[in-house]
């Protein structure tokens, strides 16, 4: 039975990190009592492994469940009867999109300029070719904060370090005065300060090559973020982000969600080498014997019955 969403607005470090970060100390254990633990300097203790538990990485806005990130017209000419596009058929239900009430505050809409709204639509229709996540690019801010993977925080008095499972990404929040980077970046340049118990971070210097989610929501190099990290329980943070980009949006807008501390005794951010995993996707058209039916430029048309032929070097690797 088709389920329809009727509600469109959501209710509302001093040391550098290694590629794999383990936070198994008391900082990753449940806080005692109803108040957040504090560091030696009296600030809320954000040390530990954290993760968002929502569907924002699929689409920031409220949406119904659907058969795939990319769909095409089916036998019946109804929007709800669309079927997965050929490249995602073989993934079955794993390629589906879970429903969500959304995380965009206010009216739940993203205020795109008309030309930017068209680009967003085209992004969604060409997700397989365009989404930076599929190519294991650095996920960018704020997307790294709500991807379905854990991330670790190591908190110091002058710096706060974050490391993310996806793409081995990292970012540093500077709490002391620091010059901006010479070049724009995927993750941006973060400068923070404390307002009572809330960590406020301004993020600038983006290269404009990231998306916010798999639905094609995007930004330009004019993006400016103001993040607010506010403890709401011993092991939860309310994460609010005000997004401003005059090249793309008509006005600032805000997303909001909780982030949760991972409470396993051995909670760890492990290496997720997606760069290696995406090599066939990005460079398969250069193979002498391609694994897909054919390529049109860098766009693959997948033959889901294609098997790696015996004798192929990759075939022998899988037999090990």
Give the location of each predicted region.
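PEST-like low-complexity, intrinsically disordered acidic/proline/serine-rich tracts
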Residues: 2-320
């Amino acid at each position: 039975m088709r389920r329809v969403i009727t509600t469109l607005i959501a209710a509302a470090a001093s040391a550098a990190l290694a590629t794999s970060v383990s936070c198994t100390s008391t900082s990753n254990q449940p806080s005692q009592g109803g108040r957040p633990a504090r560091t030696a300097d009296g600030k809320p203790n954000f040390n530990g492994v954290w993760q968002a538990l929502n569907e924002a990485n699929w689409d920031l806005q409220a949406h119904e469940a659907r058969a795939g990130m990319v769909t095409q017209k089916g036998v019946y000419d109804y929007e709800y009867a669309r079927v997965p596009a050929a490249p995602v058929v073989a993934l079955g239900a794993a390629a589906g999109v879970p429903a969500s009430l959304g995380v965009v505050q206010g009216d739940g809409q993203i205020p795109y300029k008309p030309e930017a709204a068209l680009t967003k639509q085209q992004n969604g229709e060409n997700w397989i070719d365009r989404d930076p996540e599929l190519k294991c690019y650095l996920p960018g801010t704020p997307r790294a904060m709500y991807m379905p993977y854990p991330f670790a925080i190591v908190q110091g008095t002058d710096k706060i370090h974050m490391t993310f499972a996806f793409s081995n990404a990292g970012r540093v929040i500077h709490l002391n005065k620091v010059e901006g980077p010479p070049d724009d970046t995927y993750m941006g340049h973060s400068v923070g300060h404390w307002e009572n118990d809330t960590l406020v971070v301004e993020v600038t210097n983006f290269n404009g090559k990231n998306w916010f989610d798999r639905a094609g929501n995007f930004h330009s190099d004019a993006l400016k973020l103001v993040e607010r990290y506010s403890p709401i329980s011993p092991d939860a943070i309310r994460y609010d982000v005000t997004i401003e980009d005059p090249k793309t949006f008509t006005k600032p807008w805000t997303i909001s969600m909780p982030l949760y501390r991972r409470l396993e005794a051995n909670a760890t951010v492990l290496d997720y080498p997606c760069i290696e995993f995406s090599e066939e996707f990005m460079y398969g058209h250069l193979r002498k014997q391609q694994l897909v039916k054919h390529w049109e430029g860098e766009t693959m048309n997948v033959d889901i019955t294609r098997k790696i032929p015996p004798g192929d070097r990759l075939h022998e690797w899988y037999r090990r």
